[in-house]
Amino acid sequence: MDPIISAASVIGAGLSIGLAAIGPGIGQGTAAGQAVEGIARQPEAENKIRGVLLLSLAFMEALTIYGLVVALALLFANPFNT
């Protein structure tokens, strides 16, 4: 394999997982903070808020997993390999 393609694949894999983790990381922090604030304001709605929060966190985490899949594809099943 060409060393330039190898290097570009490694850099691309690093960028894909790094950039895929930034958005969900910020979103999860914001969502958790707002959930804690909502529970503090309305303790009787704790179960409903917690359920929605966990579902939202799972959807946000899926974006990071997609970035991981792209990174693994670039590293191990390199589509640019000739």
UniProtKB/Swiss-Prot annotation:
GO molecular function terms noted in the UniProt entry: lipid binding; proton-transporting ATP synthase activity, rotational mechanism
InterPro entries linked to this entry: ATP_synth_csu_bac/chlpt (IPR005953), ATP_synth_F0_csu (IPR000454), ATP_synth_F0_csu_DDCD_BS (IPR020537), ATP_synth_F0_csu_sf (IPR038662), ATPase_proteolipid_c-like_dom (IPR002379), F/V-ATP_Csub_sf (IPR035921)
Superkingdom as given in the UniProt entry: Eukaryota
The UniProt record lists the keyword Cytoplasm: no
Gene3D superfamilies, A to Z: F1F0 ATP synthase subunit C
Location(s), subcellular: Plastid, Chloroplast thylakoid membrane
GO cellular component: chloroplast thylakoid membrane; proton-transporting ATP synthase complex; proton-transporting two-sector ATPase complex, proton-transporting domain
One Pfam family linked to the record: ATP-synt_C
Key words of the record: ATP synthesis, CF(0), Chloroplast, Hydrogen ion transport, Ion transport, Lipid-binding, Membrane, Plastid, Thylakoid, Transmembrane, Transmembrane helix, Transport
Membrane-related topology note: Multi-pass membrane protein
Segments passing through the bilayer: 3-23, 57-77
Main location: plastid
Site feature: Reversibly protonated during proton transport: 61
Role description: F(1)F(0) ATP synthase produces ATP from ADP in the presence of a proton or sodium gradient. F-type ATPases consist of two structural domains, F(1) containing the extramembraneous catalytic core and F(0) containing the membrane proton channel, linked together by a central stalk and a peripheral stalk. During catalysis, ATP synthesis in the catalytic domain of F(1) is coupled via a rotary mechanism of the central stalk subunits to proton translocation.
Subunit text: F-type ATPases have 2 components, F(1) - the catalytic core - and F(0) - the membrane proton channel. F(1) has five subunits: alpha(3), beta(3), gamma(1), delta(1), epsilon(1). F(0) has four main subunits: a(1), b(1), b'(1) and c(10-14). The alpha and beta chains form an alternating ring which encloses part of the gamma chain. F(1) is attached to F(0) by a central stalk formed by the gamma and epsilon chains, while a peripheral stalk is formed by the delta, b and b' chains.
Note: In plastids the F-type ATPase is also known as CF(1)CF(0).
Entry's family note: Belongs to the ATPase C chain family.
Protein name, entry field: ATP synthase subunit c, chloroplastic
